Amino acid sequence: MSHKKQDAFQGLIDALKVLPNVGPKSAQRIAYHLLQHKRKEAEKLVDALQTALKQVDHCARCNTFCEGGLCDICADETRDGRRLMVVHMPADVSNMEAANCHDGLYFVLMGQINTALGMDVSAIALDRLAQRLGGGEVEEIIIATAFTAEGNATAYVLSEFFKNLPYKVSRLSQGIPLGGELEYVDAGTLAQAVYERRLIKEGGA
């Protein structure tokens, strides 16, 4: 039994479906639009993606995306290394920086726990977080996950992970709307959530 060779257009649709919140219909519309109206822009997109794949990697300390060994924040010696904020994704770091409410450092999990999608503890880079804490300067860990089912599950796992470790642990206050992702929260609300963060455990073993 022979199989029809996949054509280039269908291959483009299938490739676009890997993007967040892009299903078959959306992928088809994007493919039509790029090929019919935005061919030059599509070529620039391909070039930019190829360049990023070659040059962008993870920061050796905080796990965010950067070019070179350390991101600008980790390389900044004026930051307060005693406070480490743990966030879901790089966009959360950008939002915190825009809110100007945290002068410490970050660790980016690059994922969150979602059992429905088969994303367990292996999705949140706990091994890299443990390595990051090996430096000994951290005193307080601020859990800055969203107040969604996935964010709460991730926060619970992190709380258990830190339970017997000698760190003060806190979490953002619930000024952030229930079900809200940090990337959609305004700077004022985000700053208030940091300043009024809820203590989970005191420091010390």
Curated annotation (Swiss-Prot):
Domain Toprim: 82-177
Function: May play a role in DNA repair. It seems to be involved in an RecBC-independent recombinational process of DNA repair. It may act with RecF and RecO.
UniProt-recorded name of the protein: Recombination protein RecR
Disulfide bonds: none
GO molecular-function term, one example from the UniProt record: DNA binding
Keyword Iron included in the entry's annotation: no
Family statement drawn from the similarity comment of this UniProt entry: Belongs to the RecR family.
GO biological process, one term: DNA recombination
InterPro entries in UniProt: DNA_Rcmb_RecR, Rcmb_RecR, Rcmb_RecR_Znf, TOPRIM_dom, TOPRIM_RecR
Keywords from the named record: DNA damage, DNA recombination, DNA repair, Metal-binding, Zinc, Zinc-finger
Name of the coding gene: recR
Classification via SUPFAM superfamilies: Recombination protein RecR (SSF111304)
Species this protein is from: Neisseria meningitidis serogroup A / serotype 4A (strain DSM 15465 / Z2491)
Coiled-coil blocks: none
Zinc finger motifs (C4-type), residue ranges: 59-74
